[in-house]
Amino acid sequence: MTLVDFTAAWCPPCRVLGAVLAALVPAYAGRVRFTAVDVDAEPALAERFGVRAMPTVVLLRDGREVGRVVGSRPRAFVAGMLDRALAGDMAIAGP
């Protein structure tokens, strides 16, 4: 599974979420690949994924989107989302 964090350097909530995601990396090592996309550097990729606000987190399994969350979220929320996705619960997208 891959978690893609669509972010921007000028976005304060993106920095908060970035710290949350960085703290979760060790707990999900070998199960989730964490990556970040700077929407200013990669606007075509952000457009391809329909990103309209930052931060936006997209979860991919085998190249297919299985979840999406817009906005900064606390660590427990993100961990719960990842746990559900890893367990195969496809209804994980949040507002």
Give the location of each predicted region.
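Non-catalytic, surface beta->alpha helical segment in thiol-disulfide oxidoreductase systems
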Residues: V58-G94
